[in-house]
Amino acid sequence: MTTSASSHLNKGIKQVYMSLPQGEKVQAMYIWIDGTGEGLRCKTRTLDSEPKCVEELPEWNFDGSSTLQSEGSNSDMYLVPAAMFRDPFRKDPNKLVLCESFQVQFEGPAETNLRHTCKRIMDMVSNQHPWFGMEQEYTLMGTDGHPFGWPSNGFPGPQGPYYCGVGADRAYGRDIVEAHYRACLYAGVKIAGTNAEVMPAQWEFQIGPCEGISMGDHLWVARFILHRVCEDFGVIATFDPKPIPGNWNGAGCHTNFSTKAMREENGLKYIEEAIEKLSKRHQYHIRAYDPKGGLDNARRLTGFHETSNINDFSAGVANRSASIRIPRTVGQEKKGYFEDRRPSANCDPFSVTEALIRTCLLNETGDEPFQYKN
C-alpha cells in the first residue's frame, strides 16, 4: 500500500509555525461541493476579527471552470456561507465555513448546490420537527487504490471478525478513526459514534440527530474533516458504494428519520403511513440516493451483503435486508423512527433528506419532484 508524499513531511517543523501567534486575525476555510456532486473544494481567507455567526461572514468567489462547474469564458462563481464550525486543524479562533455555490451572484444555485432547494423544503415542514441521523460508511485506501492493511498480492481472511473488531489483525486504521472522531467533536459536528464495519478497512461514523437542513451541513463537514485527517496520514477515504467487487460488503449511508408525531405515543402509526408512501415511490428515491441517479447503488443493492435489491421495495422489523428497517425497539414501543437503508455512501445528504420530506410529509407522488412556487 502506498501513502502520499505529503504525509512523509516533518510535521514537527510545521508545528513550529502553527504555534506562532496570529494576532486579531482569523483564518476562515470556505468549503463547497464541486461539479461532481461528491468532491469537496476549499480555500482560506483572512478575517479581521472572529465571526460570531454565519451571517457575519463575507461572500466570496472562485473559478468554476476549475471545479467542473462552469465554462472558462464565464467562470466566476460565488460562495455564500451557510454553516460555520470551529477549525480542528488550525484551532480557535479559526473557522470552517460550509458554503452554497451560485452560478451568478443572487441568480440561482449551481447545479450541485442541492442545499438551496433542500432548505426551502425543510422550511415548509419545520413545524413537524423532522430529525435525521445518517450512518456514513467509508473505506480506507492507499494512494494506489489498494485497501489499507490488505495484503499486497491477495486478500485478507473472510468477513466475520472485522465488524466492531479489536486487535491488529481485525481493526485496520483505528488511529485515523480516533483522530477524525475527536476533530469532529472539537469542530462542533454532531457525531454520535463510530465503529469498524464488516469489510476490513471499512469504518462507519454516525451523525445526528440533526433537525432539518443541519443534517446535510453536519455530514458534509464531517466528510471534509475525514478527508483532511486522511490527508495528514497519507491515505484516502473513499465513499464508493462498492469499492471492492466480489464477496465483500459495500458501503452505504443508512438514514434514520422521524417527526415529532412519530416520536410521540402511538407514533408507529405515522411511521407505517410514511413507509406506505415510500413503497409507491421507490424509483424516485433510488435516483435521489446516489449522485449518478442510481447507477452507483446498482453495484451495491444486490440483495446480498445486508442490502435489499435495487429493483424491489421491502420493509420489515429488524430486517437488514429490507429497503426500510423498523428497529425492534420501535416495534415494541410503538414510537420512534425508521431506517432507510437504500442511500449509498456517496449520496448527497441534502438530496436524501429532501426526498424523504417530499414523499413522507408533503405527500408527493410520481417520479419527479413537485415544483413549488416561491
Curated annotation (Swiss-Prot):
Pfam families in the record: Gln-synt_C, Gln-synt_N
Required for glutamine-induced ubiquitination by CRL4(CRBN) and proteasomal degradation: annotated span: 2-25
* Modulation of this protein's activity: Glutamine synthetase activity is inhibited by methionine sulfoximine (MSO).
Start and end of every GS catalytic domain?
Answer: 114-374
Q: How is it modified after translation?
A: Palmitoylated; undergoes autopalmitoylation.
One GO BP annotation is: positive regulation of erythrocyte differentiation
The source's superkingdom equals Eukaryota
Which keywords accompany this UniProt record?
Acetylation, Angiogenesis, ATP-binding, Cell membrane, Cytoplasm, Endoplasmic reticulum, Ligase, Lipoprotein, Magnesium, Manganese, Membrane, Metal-binding, Microsome, Mitochondrion, Nucleotide-binding, Palmitate, Phosphoprotein, Transferase, Ubl conjugation
Q: Name one GO molecular function term.
A: protein-cysteine S-palmitoyltransferase activity
Task: List every position bearing Phosphoserine.
Answer: 344
Positions bound to Mn(2+) 2: 137, 197, 204
Q: Which residues cross the membrane?
A: none
Q: Where in the cell is it found?
A: Cytoplasm, Cytosol; Microsome; Mitochondrion; Cell membrane
* Broad class of where this protein is predominantly found: cytoplasm
Q: Tell me the cofactors it needs.
A: Mg(2+); Mn(2+)
Q: Which residues carry this modification: N6-acetyllysine?
A: 11, 14
Domain GS beta-grasp: from-to ranges:
24-106
Q: How does it sit in the membrane?
A: Lipid-anchor
Q: What residues bind Mn(2+) 1, as annotated? A: 135, 254, 339
Its biological function?
A: Glutamine synthetase that catalyzes the ATP-dependent conversion of glutamate and ammonia to glutamine. Its role depends on tissue localization: in the brain, it regulates the levels of toxic ammonia and converts neurotoxic glutamate to harmless glutamine, whereas in the liver, it is one of the enzymes responsible for the removal of ammonia.
Q: How does it assemble?
A: Decamer; composed of two pentamers. Interacts with PALMD. Interacts with RHOJ. Interacts with BEST2; this interaction tethers a fraction of GLUL to the membrane, causing a decrease of cytosolic glutamine synthase (GS) activity and inhibits the chloride channel activity of BEST2 by affecting the gating at the aperture in the absence of intracellular glutamate.
Q: Which family does it belong to?
A: Belongs to the glutamine synthetase family.
Report what the protein is called. Glutamine synthetase
Biological source species: Macaca fascicularis (Crab-eating macaque)
The organism's lineage is: Eukaryota, Metazoa, Chordata, Craniata, Vertebrata
Q: Which gene encodes it?
A: GLUL
